[in-house]
From Swiss-Prot:
GO terms for cellular component: cytoplasm. The active site is at S157 (nucleophile), D320, H350. HAMAP family: MetX_acyltransf (MF_00296). It is found in: Cytoplasm. This is Homoserine O-acetyltransferase. Residues 52-356 form the AB hydrolase-1 domain. Its EC number is 2.3.1.31. Belongs to the AB hydrolase superfamily. MetX family. Pathway: Amino-acid biosynthesis; L-methionine biosynthesis via de novo pathway; O-acetyl-L-homoserine from L-homoserine: step 1/1. Homodimer.
Amino acid sequence: MTISDVPTQTLPAEGEVRLVDIGSLRLESGAVIDNVCIALQRWGELSPTRDNVVMVLHALTGDSHVTGPAGPGHSTPGWWDGMVGPGAPIDTNRWCAVATNVLGGCRGSTGPSSLARDGKPWGSRFPLISVRDQVEADMAALAALGITQVAAVVGGSMGGARALEWIVGHPDRVRSALLLAVGARATADQIGTQTTQIAAIKADPNWRNGDYHETGCKPEAGLKVARRFAHLTYRGEIELDSRFANDGQGGEDPADGGRYAIQSYLEHQGDKLLARFDAGSYVILTEALNRHDVGRGRDGIHAALRGCPVPVVVGGITSDRLYPLRLQQELADLLPGCAGLEVVDSIRGHDGFLVESEAVGELIHKTLRLAEDRSSRPW
């Protein structure tokens, strides 16, 4: 599929979820997914010249609902409230913020729980996808709305990987970027923790090789364990110890078989994810993260990054143990459009990019100033 093959559709009303039909999508692997839909939301008005779009790219279990309360089509509040809106870092008086639910997801976009052409869930038939495939799907969704270039791409974690693929793969389509809490490729540590999460899901008897959607039984136990393990990598060690230490949960005594406070906290995180996420999507998206490598097929990471002309802000979190600062330092050193690594001092670990609003907001401001600086120049 090429961009010109996609018919033009209309932008949704502000905050409304719209399913954008992008037709068939040929993946990096050569496989084809038919009848692909991408869930999309926007905030702010599109300028007459269509040059003020800021793409906000979510992390692994996020969705298109960046800001606002829970409501029809989005059962949870916005995952980055305060970052988008009138007077916010992405000021909707100036910018049109657009967010998609990623290809392979489960919040409206085509993924393993979606119905295939035969009317049955894709399940195990859903092909392996890459971060590059996710970017191609996003670009096709934008093109269906008549948008072929964006002012900026902004994302952290998996969203940062998508933003990186945007600027390296399509530098002519974006004026600036913010890369938060991400690296140029998956590390052995990330792959190790993430394949272990996948193994927990697949060890659940209800997984049924991914074909569980019509059985009435989901691999809930496996998904909860995966989320508990993942959440430990998202938070800082000092933060967790200062909050929970080795305390029991409430009146429970661990010495007498009761739960620890940290144990209860992680169980709660697993329960919350069960209410809104599909295990098949968790596996597919985690596998895509494991294969993330911006240098693949581009003569390696050094060549891929050195050849990217897009002005970029790179940010990292001091206590991030999933994507440690050395990974962002590599990006900052090799991307010619980066003026230097921006360090966010936080004890909150990888999730600092979501919760350190003031510091991250300033990085967004810097990114959009770069977009403004290039607005009068040829693309």
